């Protein structure tokens, strides 16, 4: 349903079982089935790439209009959604695990209750420049997150 709403859309997936370490081994079979299906959908704008180094991935995320991440019930933090938010990219997520803590619904993205809402909100964010700009601006103005190197220096001073 998302692709027909805008034929210029691309869904770039940078993933593989290596992305998730030991957790990835546990889910290797399922993730490989999903990625195999996704690779067959290239004509619908879906591109599957191998995992990237962190800095390279950040550059790809910054180029994105929206960050889509359904999440899982056992999600306890969701670093990828947090990183997208810090990079100023609005997210569309499902209300699993910690997603509602990562994304402020209707302010920095959408937290959806089911697949139907996920599709609807994704289309809205992709096609509505005003809503996208509002969410992007909220992310930028509230971006007071420190880099890890700065946090480490603060802790070094405290521990001296």
Predicted regions and their residues:
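A charged, aromatic-enriched C-terminal amphipathic alpha-helix characteristic of glycosyltransferases
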Residues: 113, 129-160
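Conserved acidic donor-binding segment of nucleotide-sugar-dependent glycosyltransferases
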Residues: 105-116, 124-129
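Nucleotide-activated donor-binding/catalytic signature segment of Leloir-type glycosyltransferases, i.e.
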Residues: 25-55
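Acidic donor-binding loop of glycosyltransferase active sites
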Residues: 62-76
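Short alpha-helical segment that forms part of, or immediately flanks, the ligand-binding pocket
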Residues: 58, 81-86, 100-101
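Short glycine/acidic-rich beta->alpha loop that forms part of the nucleotide-sugar donor binding site
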Residues: 75-78, 85, 95-96
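Active-site donor-sugar recognition loop in glycosyltransferases
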Residues: 56, 72-76, 98
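Short hydrophobic beta-strand element within catalytic cores of glycosyltransferases
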Residues: 90-93
